[in-house]
Curated annotation (Swiss-Prot):
SUPFAM superfamilies: Translation proteins (SSF50447)
Keyword list, A-Z: Ribonucleoprotein, Ribosomal protein, RNA-binding, rRNA-binding
Pfam families named among the record's database cross-references: Ribosomal_L3
Molecular function terms from GO: rRNA binding; structural constituent of ribosome
Protein name: Large ribosomal subunit protein uL3
Region described as Disordered: 1-20
Family stated for the protein in its record: Belongs to the universal ribosomal protein uL3 family.
Species this protein is from: Methanosarcina mazei (strain ATCC BAA-159 / DSM 3647 / Goe1 / Go1 / JCM 11833 / OCM 88) (Methanosarcina frisia)
Superkingdom classification of source: Archaea
Role description: One of the primary rRNA binding proteins, it binds directly near the 3'-end of the 23S rRNA, where it nucleates assembly of the 50S subunit.
Length: 337
C-alpha cells in the first residue's frame, strides 16, 4: 500500500544543505592501526567512468564464477609528498596539535597554498616531537601531505591540495619512526593500497546551485486546481500557525550539491601505472588522457571529473577479504557517443 503521508523524500540527516567550506574533503576519524607502518589515506583526481569484464568472486552470488560487467571509476593518482609530521595531545576537550616538523625541501608550488616554514625547522621539530613522546604527552602522530597536480595533463592547475593523513602502526614509536622516514619524500599509491582492498572514498559532490523544493527534496507536484494557480512546483504550506515560525524541517528551495559525501567500503579493482590501459579512444570527456598511475574503483564516486578524491583505509571494514580480482577486459571504447 502506498504511503499516505509523504511530506518529502530527502533526508534531514544532511542538513544544513549548504556549500562545503573547501573542495578538499576531510576525514574526521581514522581506523585502528594494525600491520606494517603506512599512511592510512591517499588522494587522486577523478577522471571518469568505464566498465570492466571480470570474474564474479563474491561468495554465494548468483553469478559466482561467471563473467560479469562491472562499472568502474577511474582516479588518477600521482605520487604525493609528505610535508610535515604533526603530533597531537588529548585532553578533556579533545585532540589538539602541539608540535610540527616540516620538511626542509618542499615544492615551490606549495607557496601558492600556504606560507612555507623556515628550512631549519625539520631537525628541531623532530627533536621536539621525540621529547614530547618520551614525556608521554603525545596521543597520536599524523602526516601532512600534499598532491602534485602539475604532473597531470587533465587537471589544469599547479596549486597543491594539502591534507592530513593518519599513520597505521602498532604504537607511537613505530608511527614516529615511519613518519621520519617518509618526511619530505614521495609516496606512491602502491605504498598505501593494493589490488582488491576495500577503501572509503570522500569527495565534494557536483554543485547544482539554487534549486527548487521538487528537485532538492523530492516533494510531489501540486494537484488539481492548486497546480493551475501559479504554484505547481511549490510546497502546500510553510507549517502551522503556531508556533509562529518556520521550521527547518520544511522542504524549501536552496543550495543543492557541492556537499561533502563519504562512501564506505568501495573495492579497488586495479592499481596501474600505464594510463593507456584505461584511456578510451579520444580521451575521457572533460578530462583527456590518463598518463600516469591510476586506480579503478568499483562503482561510482561523488564529484565531477577533475575533482579531488580522497581514499582511506575502511573504518567499517568488511570481515571477508575477497583478494585480488580477476579482470578480463577493460573497456576503452570512446565515451563521446
Amino acid at each position: 500500500m502506498a504511503s499516505i503521508h509523504r511530506p518529502k523524500r530527502g533526508s534531514l540527516a544532511f542538513s544544513p544543505r549548504k556549500r562545503a567550506k573547501s573542495h578538499i574533503p576531510r576525514f574526521r576519524a581514522w581506523p585502528e592501526a594494525t600491520g606494517e607502518p603506512k599512511l592510512q589515506s591517499f588522494a587522486g583526481y577523478k577522471v571518469g567512468m568505464t566498465h570492466v569484464i571480470m570474474v564474479d568472486d563474491i561468495k554465494n552470488s548468483l553469478t559466482q564464477g561467471m563473467e560479469i560487467s562491472v562499472p568502474v571509476t577511474v582516479i588518477e593518482t600521482p605520487a604525493i609528498r609528505v610535508a610535515a609530521v604533526r603530533a597531537y595531545t588529548e585532553d578533556s576537550t579533545g585532540e589538539k596539535a602541539i608540535a610540527e616538523a616540516w620538511a626542509a625541501d618542499l615544492d615551490s608550488e606549495l607557496k601558492r597554498r600556504i606560507p612555507i616554514p623556515a628550512a631549519g625547522n625539520q631537525a628541531e621539530g623532530l627533536e621536539n616531537i621525540g621529547k614530547l613522546i618520551e614525556e608521554g604527552r603525545v596521543s597520536d602522530i599524523r602526516a601532512v601531505t600534499y598532491t602534485l597536480p602539475k604532473s597531470l595533463t587533465g587537471v589544469p592547475k599547479k596549486v597543491p591540495d594539502i591534507m592530513e593523513s593518519g599513520i597505521s602502526a602498532k604504537d607511537l614509536g613505530a608511527k614516529f619512526e615511519y613518519a621520519k622516514s617518509i618526511l619530505g619524500n614521495l609516496v606512491n599509491v602502491t605504498d598505501v593500497f593494493k589490488n582488491g582492498t576495500v577503501v572509503d572514498t570522500a569527495a565534494i559532490t557536483i554543485g547544482k546551485g539554487t534549486q527548487g523544493p521538487v528537485k532538492r527534496w523530492g516533494i510531489q507536484l501540486q494537484k488539481g486546481k492548486h497546480s493551475r494557480q501559479g504554484s505547481l512546483r511549490q510546497i502546500g504550506t510553510l507549517g502551522s500557525f503556531n508556533p509562529s515560525r518556520v521550521s527547518w524541517r520544511v522542504p524549501q528551495m536552496g543550495q543543492m550539491g557541492y556537499h561533502q559525501r563519504t562512501e564506505f567500503n568501495k573495492r579497488i579493482l586495479k592499481i596501474g601505472s600505464d594510463g593507456e590501459e584505461v584511456t578510451p579512444e579520444g580521451g575521457f570527456i572533460n578530462y583527456g588522457l590518463v598518463r600516469g598511475d591510476y586506480v579503478l574503483i568499483k562503482g561510482s564516486v561523488p564529484g565531477p571529473s577533475k575533482r579531488l578524491i580522497r581514499l582511506r583505509d575502511p573504518i567499517r571494514a568488511k570481515k571477508a577479504d575477497l583478494g585480488e580480482p580477476n579482470i578480463l577486459y577493460i573497456s576503452r571504447e570512446s565515451k563521446q557517443g
